[in-house]
Amino acid sequence: MPELPEVETIMRGISPFLEGATIKKIKLNRADLRWPFPENFASRVREAKVLNLKRRSKYILVDLSTGETLLIHLGMSGKILVSGSKIGNYFYESSKRSYHDHVIFELNDGTKITYNDPRRFGAMDLAKTNDVNNHKFLEKLGPEPLGNNFNTDYLKT
């Protein structure tokens, strides 16, 4: 299972490709991951501009221009692959789709962001950006270990 530092590294690695990009197409190669995708998932994400990425615990949060945030959890074996772009060292070349490529986002510049998860323990959901911290995945999480609220005063309580 990707631990918090790896999720942070993945989030930072895909940010240059996603931030400012528009999701032109989305292909769901199955109806669910660990849980079913939210209702109208593809149409709610399609044509949205990616405003920014952040991490909360082991979740990657993708703020969209639609006022919603895409929550991504990698589960035990999930990974995010970037293809069709020559920027950075994240280029992934494959002539055919892997059986475990469950979600493919195609961006306005032709870059493809592929969520691959052999065990399907990962998850994707959408939440209102202004209420994302009350989402069922996030509402009971403790303070962020890299944040200012995780300090000696918190540890004393």
Feature map (PLM): residue ranges:
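Extended, highly charged segments
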Residues: 1-68, 85-87, 106, 111
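Phosphate/anion-contacting hairpin/loop surfaces
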Residues: 70-157
